[in-house]
């Protein structure tokens, strides 16, 4: 099924929520595979995930992974979806500095000329990823 919001096909939008919204009993690979159309290549997904997750975590149920690992699975799922717009809500929550830099490289690699909308409190993160940055510095009611 498809629908549109102001003429934009909602199937062209991918989102990573602040809460990971993963399927707990599925592996990292299967959580990514489930959003892909057609017959996704399991080995390609594995190779893709290896750039941000250790090999021994890829086939484990995501409910057994750490918070930072779950975050990276959610990110991989959002970036793997073939949408034109990718919305990432606080993608760096729970990540240490080195992991965050690795994830930033991953985002840039997986971007594929698509539009990213990233909500973050980290000005440095926004500067590394953003071509255009909009800063909200007051509460909006």
Spans of features found by a protein language model:
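Catalytic Walker B motif of ABC-type/P-loop ATPase nucleotide-binding domains
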Residues: 86-90
